[in-house]
Amino acid sequence: MIGEHKALVQRITNETKIQIAISLNGGHIELPESILDKNPTQENNIATQATTSQVIDIHTGVGFLDHMIHALAKHSGWSLIVECIGDLHIDDHHTTEDCGIALGEAFKQALGQVRGVKRFGCGFAPLDEALSRAVVDLSNRPYAVIDLGLKREKIGDLSCEMIPHFLESFIEAARLTVHIDCLRGFNDHHRSESAFKALAVAIREATAPNGTNDVPSTKGVLM
C-alpha cells in the first residue's frame, strides 16, 4: 500500500485492558506508554522481533496466542505491538476474544478507505505436514468461515476452541470476508500456525496496490 497506514487502538473493559499500535507497511511504531510491567526474560519476549523493516512485540499473557499473532504480523508485513492485561485467572476466553476484536479494529483503522488495492487475496502456507489455505475479501461485509480441524483440547495455554474464535473476532471487527481451511496435517500446532500464515499471505495480497486509485467495486464504494 502507498502512504501511511497506521493506527493506535485502546480497548478497556472490566475483563481486559488492551492497547495496539500497527503499521500495515511495517517500519517504526511505538506506544505512547506501556501498560505492562515487563521483565526482559526470554520467556516473555518470545514474540518480540525488531528488524529495519518491522517491529513486532506481542504480549497477551497467553503464550501460544502471542506466537500466532507474531506469525500473522510477520508474514503480513506489519509492524505490530500488542499489550494486554486480561482476567486469565478465569480462563483464556476474554483475553483471546478481546485481542481479536482490538486487532481487527486497529487493522480497519489503519487500512482506511479500500481504494487502490487488489481487494482480494489468496494464500497457501505449509508447515511440515500441515497445509492451509486462506481467501480474503476487503469487502466491509464481515463473514468468517473457518475449518481448522483441531483435535487437542489445548495448545500450550490456549484452548483450541479459542483459536478459530480469535480469527472470527478479528475478521468481524476488521469487516472482512475470510475463508480459512486447513487442508491436511496431524499436528495441531502446525495446523494452527499454517492457518495464521496463510491468512497473512492472503491479507498481504489483498492490500497490495492495484495500480489505480479506484475503489475496487462495481458499487463504487465499499462501506
Curated annotation (Swiss-Prot):
UniProt-listed Pfam families: IGPD
Catalysed transformations (reactions): D-erythro-1-(imidazol-4-yl)glycerol 3-phosphate = 3-(imidazol-4-yl)-2-oxopropyl phosphate + H2O
Pathway: Amino-acid biosynthesis; L-histidine biosynthesis; L-histidine from 5-phospho-alpha-D-ribose 1-diphosphate: step 6/9
A biological-process GO annotation: L-histidine biosynthetic process
Entry's EC annotation: 4.2.1.19
Keywords: Amino-acid biosynthesis, Histidine biosynthesis, Lyase
One example GO MF annotation: imidazoleglycerol-phosphate dehydratase activity
PANTHER family tied to this protein: IMIDAZOLEGLYCEROL-PHOSPHATE DEHYDRATASE (PTHR23133:SF2), IMIDAZOLEGLYCEROL-PHOSPHATE DEHYDRATASE HIS7 (PTHR23133)
Family: Belongs to the imidazoleglycerol-phosphate dehydratase family.
Designated name of the protein: Imidazoleglycerol-phosphate dehydratase
Lineage, highest ranks first: Eukaryota, Fungi, Dikarya, Ascomycota, Saccharomycotina
Gene name of the record: HIS3
